[in-house]
Amino acid sequence: MATKEKLQCLKDFHKDILKPSPGKSPGTRPEDEAEGKPPQREKWSSKIDFVLSVAGGFVGLGNVWRFPYLCYKNGGGAFLIPYFIFLFGGGLPVFFLEVIIGQYTSEGGITCWEKICPLFSGIGYASIVIVSLLNIYYVIILAWATYYLFQSFQSELPWAHCNHSWNTPQCMEDTMRKNKSLWITLSTKNFTSPVTEFWERNVLSLSSGIDDPGSLKWDLALCLLLVWLVCFFCIWKGVKSTGKVVYFTATFPFAMLLVLLVRGLTLPGAGAGIKFYLYPDISRLEDPQVWIDAGTQIFFSYAICLGAMTSLGSYNKYKYNSYRDCMLLGCLNSGTSFVSGFAIFSILGFMAQEQGVDIADVAESGPGLAFIAYPKAVTMMPLPTFWSILFFIMLLLLGLDSQFVEVEGQVTSLVDLYPSFLRKGFRREIFIAFMCSISYLLGLSMVTEGGMYVFQLFDYYAASGVCLLWVAFFECFVIAWIYGSDNLYDGIEDMIGYRPGPWMKYSWAVVTPVLCVGCFIFSLVKYVPLTYNKVYVYPTWAIGLGWSLALSSMMCVPLVMVIRLCQTEGPFLVRLKYLLTPREPNRWAVEREGATPYSSRLAVNGALMKPTHIIVETMM
């Protein structure tokens, strides 16, 4: 067949098979048509609903408490070099890919891959396993923030002094530390600060280890319940309600971050903190860990490989120009991370000056920044109660809208597996309540006296960078080398009216897979077993459990491949060709409704469906 005819054949196939019919949503259900009720998949009320939902989904805690610390730790301004390489070579291409395939197929994170390439539908299942585990422990941070917020409504912040029942004789107030020589003498005696004791002895009541869970912390359990109730009532009506809630939850944190930035820049010592944040150390680029941190931060901060962005994209109208908005949202996300560093390190610079210590001694990441370093800083400011309330409201809202999006992505992906059952009546709402309840009950293990050890185990393994890189590699591989980047570009052109520049398809084909593989290998080579505070060493069984959590998502891809091949009849190569071929929407819709599995029938109207790209063509 001539090359020109072959390309035309592929375009015709692509148009006939995956392009939705006029007046129908992609994935139209035949039984709805028979009843005279064309399916109306829920759509965003306006473009701004989608933009704010995505912004709220990926502008979260990681932008405020992880990026600034990584920037300082990995060479300051020099860290921006690997960061931008991973941003343009991996983060933005995968982010846009997930949004656009959701919009193109009008399916969630699992069923979109069933349409595109049934053999690799395990990609969707892997994403859902990751986001399900993430939903269990991410919300614990919000429970802690809620507890701190309630404790902030006092004339004197409870972590400012050492005169409470949970304090020990080793507690030393920060006023004593202003005398640097005295502090150097006392620090050799293992004195602790009131804010550290409040965190470890009051909030966590930290036990001796993960094998000593202790009793349930009822105050944290109630805070966790409150957060889950807020989450449920904000998403239970679908994107119509979520799209309105994010008008507040996605915008108000930016206003508060701006206030904190202005306040931080006006504090004494702010200049030293910012210099410490951005001072470039080019020699750090020789360390592979710097590149690993840059890659994993990009994937975390863009909330990709979780199925959430695909689910949000599936509610877009077919002709919506998501390419333009995805690029703008990418700028917003990375810009927020960068500006957050000024807000955080200006305050840490002030804090270091007040204590008479180096900034490196007060710089923290993750929970250490949010619940130790920053609460300590506000006790040194005028109006500490006001700044504490402001900070924890911002932290809570940043986390809440991310949680909304992650749970919505999880629910959408699972509901799309059984739409005729779960979309009837109030079944979707009941299903959301069930998922929230299960996640809450599992999360109770993290609000015990030993819960912090469980939380760290989930955070280190369950949704680790290794898992996200694994999923991202297969997403790009399937689109570029099986379905075909040009075929997807045809669909994009049909949706937005033009073809994006070649940067995206080159990234999907080469750049992103190479970055993912390199970062994945170095992550395994540089792997260090988990510890808590660099002191407590996790037992072997806990490390094994952590790797089981990581593998539970990664194994979905090969496991589903084997299951699909076993379920399909015929010679091996024939089965392989069929499973590498995009599914015809209406026939696939019948299968997902419980009819005779179409995967057991190898022909469509007596002939195999035409292949789409290189790998399938070489087999034929």
UniProtKB/Swiss-Prot annotation:
Ranges in the topological domain labelled Cytoplasmic: 1-49, 564-620
Post-translational modification summary for this protein: Taurine transport activity is down-regulated upon Ser-322 phosphorylation by PKC.
Chief location category: membrane
Organism annotation: Canis lupus familiaris
Region (Disordered): 1-42
Effect of T175A: No effect on taurine uptake; no effect on phosphorylation by PKC
Gene induction: Up-regulated in response to hypertonic stress.
Effect in UniProt of substituting T242A: No effect on taurine uptake; no effect on phosphorylation by PKC
Function summary: Mediates sodium- and chloride-dependent transport of taurine. Can also mediate transport of beta-alanine, hypotaurine and gamma-aminobutyric acid (GABA).
Similarity field: Belongs to the sodium:neurotransmitter symporter (SNF) (TC 2.A.22) family. SLC6A6 subfamily.
Keyword Oxidoreductase: no
Residues carrying a glycan: N163, N179, N190
Keyword Plastid: no
Subcellular location, record wording: Cell membrane
Listed GO biological process terms: amino acid transport; neurotransmitter transport; sodium ion transmembrane transport; taurine transmembrane transport
Lineage: Eukaryota, Metazoa, Chordata, Craniata, Vertebrata
Sites bearing Phosphoserine, chain numbering: S322
InterPro entries, per database record: Na/ntran_symport, Na/ntran_symport_taurine, SNS_sf
Name by which UniProt lists this protein: Sodium- and chloride-dependent taurine transporter
